[in-house]
């Protein structure tokens, strides 16, 4: 809008045809991003808060860990079934796959591509589903998601009372586990730019200590920002 002005047309407005769709979830008139992205990934309508599970899955609030941080799954094993995602189907065909986002990597939209869980806020247990050969790994991903980039490093690294108060209470360093399996690991735009794709086909990039990456306008205004743009990540 700033570029074209009030009388100008955005690209979407200049298309030949437009349409309206109903995006209700299985249990609500207004969906949230968990079942909506899950519907894109699986073709299945599910309840609000649920990620890539069957329609009968009930959203169960996540639990707190030993440090009082909310983010552990409260899902009963009998509560619904996982349904295949596009990433899993692509991996089964031998293709490379990735989840790249400017949100936390465990946030509902990216998480729906690689995890199955009854509540979007169980971020600590969402993260482990992306770690090949680790406890909690989503084995439907074969040898794992090839490229993972976003924010929220706290869900992937151990708790520290001074430097990582929202870190993992189980002590696991998921980034170290990925590095041990051949993943390159980066935390800044400069480190990402230095990665040689020919030598590193698998990568995890976590560009914030916690929470999402900055909005693009804020990032552009901050000359000291070390975060990549979505364009630079893709």
PLM-predicted stretches and their roles:
Residues 1-197, 201-202, 209-210, 224-231:
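N-terminal catalytic scaffold of extracellular/periplasmic and nuclease hydrolases
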Residues 220-222:
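Long, structured protein-protein interaction/assembly regions in large complexes
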